Amino acid sequence: MSATVTATPKLKSIQRTALAMLVVAGAVNYIDRATLAVANPLIREELGLSISQMGYLLSAFLWSYAFSQLPTGAMVDKIGPRRLLTAGLALWSLAQLLGGLVHSFNQFFAARLLLGVGEAPQFPTGARVVRDWFNPRDRGLATGVFNCASTLGTAIALPLLTFLMLTFGWRATFVIMGVAGLLVAVVWFALYRDPKSVALTAEETAYRTEGDPPGQRTEVTFREWKLLFRFRTTWGMILGYFGCIYLTWIYAAWLPGYLEIERHMSVKATGIAAAIPFACGVVGGVLGGYLADVLVRRGVSPVNSRKYPAAIALLGTSACTVAAAYVTSNTLAVVFISASLFLVYVTSTCAWALSSVAAPTNCTASIGAMQNFGGYLGGALAPTVTGLIVQSTGSFVLALVVGAAIGVVSAASYLFVVHDPITTAGMDQLSEPAARGAIHPA
């Protein structure tokens, strides 16, 4: 790949603005979804909920988020990131606000389902924005930057939400965050523009498309969307991300509860200790994207530069999760959990970077959303399975070991199922009558 075409000052300005807004929106996204986890003990006490009921509440968001991925990815590719993310921000912020007004399990369950639908466009939008505005050799780090919003938001969430809840109460905290999200929606719509709305020079167009396969289409069709499911790489990404997000959501949903229940920490101490692992995740996410770019520049194929780091980091996450389960020291437990989140976010960033090179441009958000669908099926199961295991055994040890085992299987999926990138020519080949029902080897 030639390195002679570089981004012009105008493109760099667009890139910086887009990434900054994606980070802000992503941080709010994760603060909102973490609010229930941080307020877990307070909400259980006020509403009289059991641990297993809290597990169902934590999973409600994840189920609606997971199943909303499939149509959302295609909608981002069809309609564009600007309008879809604006609508998503507005919807999830209203759902967050409603969370502060509930008085029963069923009302809270409905608000969490709505939150999942609203948050669904965030990361498919990020994948499409990176594909639209960055050269392939620069997409890894750009992906790491927007993806770090997930850990940055969670790291900010723990001390911020703890402060807000201790100062104003958990209900006011939900309302405050809902209003903040509505403001972000207005700013995103005002500042971001899709490429078709921006006048670009030939040099700028060359930078954006250099290294991409020829014959790229502009919008995804329903036929192309369906064909993505007939490629082994799509299924490798879906199965691989399942374990990544399962492990992530053990910690995202239960880390505060784990530190309080298993490690007997106070609410105040938990707010500080639980922020450390997610801060490590921010670093891991950015370094994962940087590593993918370095490997591409050293001649590793775009797909392999993503899938191998993703698999290796996921194996490391599983090992550290088992270690965290068995150490007796609270300090060592936080150290191993920090290492787990550092590594799992290396995997997460490499997975999203993979979505920017694994399919044609017009299918970027679609395949990213399919991957995210698989991931959040795992994410939806994690809080419920963890809650049921803890309630049954009285300990988090078995729950963490189960998560680690799932991570090993998903790492194998990245290594052995993800293969070649999906091409427009390959999709056209599968459209022929003779190929009906076949699975493409890519």
Per-region residue spans from a language model:
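Extracytoplasmic
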Residues: 17-51, 251-256
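Extracytoplasmic gate region of multi-pass secondary transporters
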Residues: 36-37, 231-288, 345-348, 352, ...
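Helix-breaking motifs and short loop linkers at transmembrane-helix boundaries and internal kinks
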Residues: 48, 80, 101-107, 118, ...
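Conserved MFS/SLC helix-loop-helix module at the cytosolic interface between two early adjacent transmembrane helices
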Residues: 67-105
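Structural signature of the two symmetry-related core transmembrane helices
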Residues: 83-97, 304-322
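Cytoplasmic helix-loop-helix junction between adjacent transmembrane helices
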Residues: 111-151
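Helix-loop-helix hairpin linking two adjacent transmembrane segments in secondary transporters
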Residues: 146-197
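A late C-terminal transmembrane helix in Major Facilitator Superfamily
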Residues: 356-393
